[in-house]
Amino acid sequence: MSATLQRVAPLSGGEGHRTPIDSGAGFVLEMRSITKAFPGVLALDGMSLKVRAGTVHVLVGENGAGKSTLMKILSGIYAIDGGEILFRGEKLDHQSAAAALERGISMIHQELSPVLDMTIAENIFLGREPTYSRTGVLSRFVDFDRMNSDTQTLLDRLGLKYSPQTKMRDLSIATMQLIEIVKAISREASLIIMDEPTSAISDTEVAMLFRQIADLKAAGVAIIYITHKMDEIFQIADDITVMRDGQFVAAAPASEYEPAKLISQMVGRTISSIFPKEEVPIGDIVLSVENLSRDGVFDNVGFEVRAGEIVGLSGLIGAGRTEVARVIFGLDAADAGVVRLNGKPLKLTSPKDAIANGIAMVSEDRKAEGLVLCRSVGENISLANLKKFASGIFISERQEETASQRMIKMLQIKTPDTAMIVENLSGGNQQKIVLAKWLLGDLKLLILDEPTRGIDVGSKSEIHRLMTEFARQGLAIIMISSELPEILGMSDRVVVMSEGRVTGELTRAEATQENIMRLATGGH
């Protein structure tokens, strides 16, 4: 997938159509003046959307804009409070996801929920297994041969080289995402909702997905596509609708948009740069990784990071970047090699050792590994530094509150107070809370694994601004990212890995998309 934004001519005079797209023919879906309220929150306020058959309609907006709520209404998970939905010319009144599926509406959720101990085939046909009967027996039996055969046909269609009998737990997250797409295709849906479908898959798999989307379009299937990735939007969209604060902002064919205009409509303000990287003084070597190896995972990895420097760790999925970071943070053990901090060799047997030496890591999966979602903002911020607030066996709530308020102000976290439950915040604010948790400590090295995955463009800009500020304060930063624009926009140097080895190191001037991809694919 190209990381270069496709720039198209902006609309002449005006900011895009102020009503849903009304040109052309063949609307498969019309959502009119949809409202939805939750206790204390108006999630959707008169939102409208029109989608043409045989097109990809990209729905964009910052986290919290209401995109997921709108799609959950369409897919039968939520009931509407007001408005109406027309699907293939008929008014929809379904009150369940099963009814939506029966109508031909299928949704691929960003957060997967496969049955891990079942096979690929069993997951795809769960609840609608093909059956056969036997003479004299009232019960029907699952036809596993047919189910496996049909699954193999679907896998071949998408180019996936897996057996239908492979257990889901043996697949990568990326492959599980593709299996969800296979499941939607198997239902012969006439409208498929894809919520961040490429958030955890490689460029090769993205290209595979886009080819399948092209086939679906040709068959007349409508696709509502939610993504924060600008390059994807302009690569795949036929039409674009922009949401903000639960309301319709604008809609137009993708050919009438350019990135700057789209971003401005999404956030309601002008963002000067998504990558506000500034030159800051580079200091002495903080981290030195020497001949680091882990059997079967990565081999002979070496690089350095200096104070005030952001080093981008780039490579394809499976290159070993996260695995190296896990060793530096003490989550996994190396079989050979040395990790030095300020020249001193470290013995890293657990994250506790890393934290004690001033090393922090923000995981790529903030919800599973970075936050306690059911706890408050204040509790999450103080989580890694409870000793600072402890007096004997008691925690000083006053000190904890003061420190949390300081972090909220410094990182500009949008929350009404420290008592707010973290699960109810946007992805961008959740990521800031993970950062705040570590910044309370005495940090020397910060490892950021996919720091802006799944967050909107406005929040991305904020995270990037904070990274620059941390570097200015002398922090050494490792940034792992699968988004080339982010690597190119934020890195002082780029270390590229392929199949568990470092294949090259590039200065900011040398770092281009072509050079990185050449090294990431094993070239020299």
Swiss-Prot record:
Keywords: ATP-binding, Cell inner membrane, Cell membrane, Membrane, Nucleotide-binding, Repeat, Sugar transport, Translocase, Transport
Binding site for ATP: G61, E62, N63, G64, A65, G66, K67, S68
A cellular component term, taken from the record's GO annotations: plasma membrane
Intracellular or extracellular location(s): Cell inner membrane
Location of the ABC transporter domain: 29-270, 280-524
EC assignment: 7.5.2.11, 7.5.2.7
Membrane topology: Peripheral membrane protein
Alphabetical list of Pfam families matching this protein: ABC_tran (PF00005)
Catalytic activity: D-ribose(out) + ATP + H2O = D-ribose(in) + ADP + phosphate + H(+); D-galactose(out) + ATP + H2O = D-galactose(in) + ADP + phosphate + H(+)
GO molecular function, one term: ATP binding
Family named by the database record: Belongs to the ABC transporter superfamily. Carbohydrate importer 2 (CUT2) (TC 3.A.1.2) family.
Function in brief: Part of an ABC transporter complex involved in carbohydrate import. Could be involved in ribose, galactose and/or methyl galactoside import. Responsible for energy coupling to the transport system.
Protein name: Putative ribose/galactose/methyl galactoside import ATP-binding protein 1
